[in-house]
C-alpha cells in the first residue's frame, strides 16, 4: 500500500491541487450569493407588490431548475441571447452565484420574519429611517439566527461546484477524472477527491462552529 502511494504521489498531488479551484468557485458564489440573496429577501418583505413578484419569480426559476442546466444555458446560450461568450470561470461564477442567491434569499427572508415585529414598530415610532432599521436592527438579528443555514449553503456549494468539471475546468472532480483515465483506475482517484471534499466540508463546519459560539456569547 505504501509503495502504491509513493508511485501515485504525483497523481495525488495533481488531484489535491484542484481543491483551490473548488474553493475559489465556492467562496465567490457564497459572497455574491449572499449579496443577491439579501437584496431579494428585502424585496420579498417589501410592501411593493412588483418587487415581491420579481423576487419570487427569480427564486422560482433558480430553485425550480437544475443547476447543471443553468450552467449550460449561461455558458452555451449566452452568445446567442446577449451576444457575449463567457469564459468557463465567468460562467461558473455567475451561475453558482445566481443559484445561491435564490436559496439564500429564502433563508434570509425566514430570518427577517422571525425577528419580533415589535422591534420594527418601535423603531418606526422613534422615527428611525426604514433603511437603518433594516441595516442596524433587523438584519443583524436575522443573520445571527440563520447563520447555520448559511453555512449549510456554503457546504452545498463546495459539493455542487463539481459540475464545473463538465466545462473542462480543472477542479477536484475534473482532475480525478483525468487521473482515472490515465491510470485505468477509477476508484483511487475518486477516493482521493472524495477525501478532499470531506476535509473541506469538515473544516468549514469546524470554523463555523467557532464563529457561531462567539456570536452566541456576543
From Swiss-Prot:
Chief location of this protein within or outside the cell: membrane
GO terms classed as biological process: amino acid transport
Membrane-traversing stretches: 25-45, 57-79, 86-108, 187-207
Domain of life: Bacteria
GO cellular component: ATP-binding cassette (ABC) transporter complex
Location(s), subcellular: Cell inner membrane
Function text: Part of the binding-protein-dependent transport system for glutamine; probably responsible for the translocation of the substrate across the membrane.
Keywords, alphabetical: Amino-acid transport, Cell inner membrane, Cell membrane, Membrane, Transmembrane, Transmembrane helix, Transport
PANTHER family according to UniProt: GLUTAMINE TRANSPORT SYSTEM PERMEASE PROTEIN GLNP, MEMBRANE COMPONENT OF AMINO ACID ABC TRANSPORTER
GO molecular function: transmembrane transporter activity
Domain ABC transmembrane type-1, residue spans: 19-208
Species of origin: Rickettsia felis (strain ATCC VR-1525 / URRWXCal2)
Cysteine pairings via disulfide bonds: none
The organism's taxonomic lineage, starting at the top: Bacteria, Pseudomonadati, Pseudomonadota, Alphaproteobacteria, Rickettsiales
Family statement: Belongs to the binding-protein-dependent transport system permease family. HisMQ subfamily.
Name of the featured protein: Putative glutamine transport system permease protein GlnP
Membrane protein topology class: Multi-pass membrane protein
Amino acid at each position: 500500500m505504501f509503495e502504491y502511494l509513493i508511485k501515485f504521489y504525483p497523481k495525488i498531488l495533481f488531484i489535491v491541487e484542484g481543491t483551490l479551484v473548488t474553493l475559489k468557485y465556492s467562496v465567490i458564489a457564497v459572497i455574491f450569493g449572499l449579496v443577491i440573496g439579501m437584496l431579494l429577501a428585502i424585496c420579498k418583505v417589501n410592501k411593493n407588490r412588483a418587487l415581491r413578484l420579481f423576487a419570487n419569480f427569480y427564486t422560482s426559476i433558480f430553485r425550480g431548475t437544475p443547476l447543471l442546466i443553468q450552467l449550460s444555458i449561461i455558458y452555451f446560450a449566452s452568445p446567442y441571447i446577449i451576444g457575449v461568450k463567457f469564459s468557463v470561470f465567468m460562467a461558473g461564477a455567475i451561475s453558482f452565484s445566481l443559484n445561491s442567491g435564490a436559496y439564500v434569499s429564502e433563508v434570509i427572508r425566514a430570518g427577517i420574519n422571525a425577528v419580533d415585529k415589535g422591534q420594527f414598530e418601535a423603531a418606526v415610532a422613534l422615527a428611525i429611517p426604514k433603511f437603518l432599521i433594516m441595516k442596524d436592527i433587523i438584519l443583524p438579528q436575522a443573520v445571527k439566527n440563520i447563520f447555520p443555514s448559511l453555512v449549510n449553503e456554503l457546504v452545498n456549494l463546495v459539493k455542487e461546484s463539481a459540475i464545473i468539471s463538465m466545462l473542462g475546468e480543472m477542479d477536484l472532480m475534473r482532475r480525478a477524472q483525468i487521473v482515472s483515465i490515465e491510470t485505468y483506475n477509477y476508484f483511487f482517484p475518486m477516493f482521493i477527491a472524495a477525501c478532499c471534499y470531506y476535509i473541506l466540508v469538515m473544516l468549514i463546519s469546524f470554523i463555523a462552529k467557532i464563529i457561531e459560539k462567539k456570536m452566541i456569547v456576543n
